[in-house]
Amino acid sequence: MSKEKFERKKPHINVGTIGHVDHGKTTLTAALTKVLAEAHGGDARAFDQIDNAPEERARGITIATAHVEYESESRHYAHVDCPGHADYVKNMITGAAQMDGSILVVSAADGPMPQTREHILLARQVGVPAIVVFLNKADMVDDAELLELVEMEVRELLSDYDFDGDNIPVVTGSALKALEGDDSEMGRPAIIKLVEAMDAHIPQPERPVDGDFLMPIEDVFSISGRGTVVTGRVERGVIKVGEEVEIVGITDTRKTTCTGVEMFRKLLDQGEAGDNIGALLRGIKRDDVERGQVLCKPKSITPHTHFEAEVYVLSKDEGGRHTPFFNGYRPQFYFRTTDVTGTVTLPEGTEMVMPGDNVKMTVQLIAPIAMEDGLRFAIREGGRTVGAGVVSKILD
């Protein structure tokens, strides 16, 4: 049987459910697929299909993630749901499933709980642009004032982490009732309302091709009589022949002009996001440029050595360290295409970090890397991955 062609009629958005264990994330995921399959076509997925999520490997880390899709009036959503708390932490830090927005699920019967807070913090640290809230299990709360109180608590918690708590949409309902086909206000209409809030509140992400040109350099060749060629996959934006570009990272930033673009041995006028290209650079010697630098639009990205990061440390079972590490730990940080040694400073009050933990840390690299908030990296020891992280704040 041939795969049916994916028709891209509607803009595509990546979302995911976050929130405390047993607050109803997976039930809501199932309800979204069911209610929207009835409204706009598509497949309904049962709770147990989603809950038995297959394990995937992302950057050497095993993560259990369920992927479902559904459509609203105006959008196509790809939605991730994780069975366990550890899977969420890993997923958000590695960016294995990039989220354009998150649906925070809070049980109206319990209110915000420790993982509610932790997931909101992670969403802030890894740069999730927007959150909408589903106040679930509202059928179990008889008191309208109590519902209002829980909503206020959630809004305050979001504001604590620099989300717009006052204006974030909060939809109240029961995912289970919706899944059972209940048409009362708490049931299916609440799911429709949630999706309308997602359509309105989660912004359309910029397409990679619309960003500022950036290409991590993977290899460097010199072609006699023509000059130096750097190769790599264009991460975002477009590079046209004749345009000025900068080489950023490791050493001092240099400016040059791209005098040729080739792909599959053919000469092109331009290369764009997703293309694997070779770019010919004017006046650059083979030794002036190296793997680990980036080619980019001038002034669009700057080199840095000092940053804060949110990091997940692999457990022993995942092939990580068998022992904890301490302040002053000096592993390699693998950014895009290369390793750079760095020194770790742990937060005050944190003596050590155990395999399987996630931790906020400050890192000082021995050489600068073209960096921006949200950049992902791996932590390695002798070529073996022992952690994964994301830059949450550039310090200098």
UniProtKB/Swiss-Prot annotation:
Entry-linked InterPro entries: EF-Tu_GTP-bd (IPR041709), EF-Tu_GTPase (IPR050055), EFTu-like_2 (IPR004161), EFTU_2 (IPR033720), G_TR_CS (IPR031157), P-loop_NTPase (IPR027417), Small_GTP-bd (IPR005225), T_Tr_GTP-bd_dom (IPR000795)
Region G2, residue ranges: 60-64
Enzyme class: hydrolase
Catalytic activity entry: GTP + H2O = GDP + phosphate + H(+)
Annotated segments matching region G5: 174-176
Residues annotated for Mg(2+) binding in this entry: 26
Binding site for GTP: 19-26, 81-85, 136-139
Molecular function, one GO term: GTPase activity
Region annotation G4: where it falls in the sequence: 136-139
Residues covered by region (G1): 19-26
Record-listed E.C. numbers: 3.6.5.3
Annotated GO CC locations: cytosol
Residues in tr-type G domain copies: 10-206
Subcellular location: Cytoplasm
Region listing for G3, in residue ranges: 81-84
The entry's keywords: Cytoplasm, Elongation factor, GTP-binding, Hydrolase, Magnesium, Metal-binding, Nucleotide-binding, Protein biosynthesis
PROSITE patterns linked: G_TR_1, G_TR_2
Cited PANTHER family: ELONGATION FACTOR TU, MITOCHONDRIAL, ELONGATION FACTOR TU-RELATED
Entry's family note: Belongs to the TRAFAC class translation factor GTPase superfamily. Classic translation factor GTPase family. EF-Tu/EF-1A subfamily.
Function: GTP hydrolase that promotes the GTP-dependent binding of aminoacyl-tRNA to the A-site of ribosomes during protein biosynthesis.
Protein name: Elongation factor Tu 2
Protein source organism: Halorhodospira halophila (strain DSM 244 / SL1)
Gene: tuf2
